[in-house]
């Protein structure tokens, strides 16, 4: 099994944090992992993306020309990466900020109102964790318990942020629970 995921958005949206937390969780679970970040000219407000490859075997190349999963937090990121998603793959998008009008009928779209949900929790900077929670539920690449372990390490000097981010992760995870066709949060690109 080799699964590649691209996370993309503006600098400051926590895109690299999503990828790094996923990569760390996969390593804790004993999987082979590569994490390849890419920054724009300016960090906050510029573009940022990263590729995470997870496998049960050695990984020959971290480059993901056709990732199975794409997670986008901004409209420019959707425009840049949408055509790279492998046929049969899943495109997760922050429907609070992104309009996904994609003519492809060969991928599944998962709309996650991450920014709106984070704002409703009075934690607008945790939109990335809302998205990561939905991603983990849908893909089952790592367990939520392992992601919670990575949060403890990530925020060991800012312990009050652990509970905030855990709440955001669970909100995204719970949003993605129903996977029926026609559900408000899940649809295919052909429907």
Which stretches of residues belong to each language-model region?
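Active-site cofactor/cluster-binding pocket
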Residues: 1-191
């Amino acid at each position: 099994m080799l699964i590649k995921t691209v996370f993309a958005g503006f600098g400051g949206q926590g895109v690299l944090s999503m990828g790094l937390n996923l990569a760390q969780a996969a390593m804790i679970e004993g999987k082979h992992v590569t994490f390849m970040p890419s920054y724009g000219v300016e960090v906050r407000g510029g573009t940022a993306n990263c590729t995470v490859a997870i496998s049960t075997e050695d990984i020959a190349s971290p480059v993901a020309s056709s990732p199975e999963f794409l997670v986008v937090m901004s409209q420019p990121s959707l425009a840049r990466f949408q055509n790279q998603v492998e046929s049969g793959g899943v495109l997760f998008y922050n429907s609070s900020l992104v309009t996904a009008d994609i003519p492809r009928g060969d991928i599944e779209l998962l709309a996650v109102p991450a920014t709106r949900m984070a704002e409703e929790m009075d934690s607008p900077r945790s939109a990335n964790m809302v998205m990561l929670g939905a991603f983990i539920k849908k893909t089952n690449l790592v367990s939520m318990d392992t992601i919670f372990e990575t949060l403890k390490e990530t925020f060991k000097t800012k312990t009050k942020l652990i509970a905030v981010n855990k709440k955001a992760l669970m909100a995204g995870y719970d949003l993605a629970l129903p996977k029926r066709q026609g559900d408000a949060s899940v649809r295919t690109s052909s429907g």
